[in-house]
A protein has these predicted regions:
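Acidic/aromatic-lined carbohydrate-recognition and catalytic surfaces
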Residues: 1-192
């Protein structure tokens, strides 16, 4: 289930939250998780977890197909999340959606990146470098990167510019979906 599936339960089948006067939906932190997938150990205070991006919107936008999503191995359990399969299945789909979106020229995306530059630029750079380092902890990176030496950072911003844009794209999607979900829940009288 996605967050949208959960919020739809406000309406169906028995409007649990509304019928039982529930006014608060308590959730775990939504940040992007690393090894161990604990929501309390996120890579960023401000970023959202790409695992929570609803792929339906990407299908509706024509960036993915239903078949691609259905043919992905998400694991066999409806009650247990297989995070390894989630990672292995979700990121190739998200990368494909990114390539198909041609988002770099989208005015709304550009505005989002500019408005959130105070955290998004460093977060996207960090994640791009982390991927380029095989997912290794930053403690294992070469000293110039680990110590954020200006020349090393400039070089990475140039060499990893497309990967940086990918991570910005994920945050753009997450933020859009989260804002819509929150507005929907708030409209039903539910605070998050």
């Amino acid at each position: 289930d996605t967050l949208w599936d959960e919020v739809k339960r406000f309406d169906y089948p028995h409007k649990y939250y509304v019928d039982f006067s529930q006014k608060l939906w308590q959730i775990l932190p939504l940040g992007p998780t690393g090894y161990g997938d604990s929501p309390y150990q996120a890579f960023s205070t401000f970023a959202g977890n790409p695992y929570l991006i609803d792929l339906e919107e990407l299908i509706e936008n024509g960036w993915l197909t239903e078949e691609e999503c259905e043919n992905t191995d998400w694991g066999g359990s409806k009650s247990y999340v297989d995070y390894e399969k989630m990672y292995q299945g979700r990121f190739p789909l998200l990368r494909k959606a990114y390539r198909n979106s041609h988002i770099a020229e989208n005015a709304e995306f550009i505005a989002f990146c500019e408005e959130n530059d105070w955290w998004l630029s460093d977060y996207a750079l960090f994640m791009a470098i982390k991927d380029s380092q095989g997912g290794a902890s930053f403690l294992e990176w070469d000293a110039p990167l680990k110590l954020r030496e200006p020349e090393a950072i400039r070089r990475c911003r140039h060499e990893l510019s497309d990967e940086i844009c990918f991570w910005q794209f994920l945050q753009y999607l997450f933020a859009k979906q989260w804002q819509a979900l929150k507005a929907y829940a708030n409209g039903k009288g539910i605070s998050i």
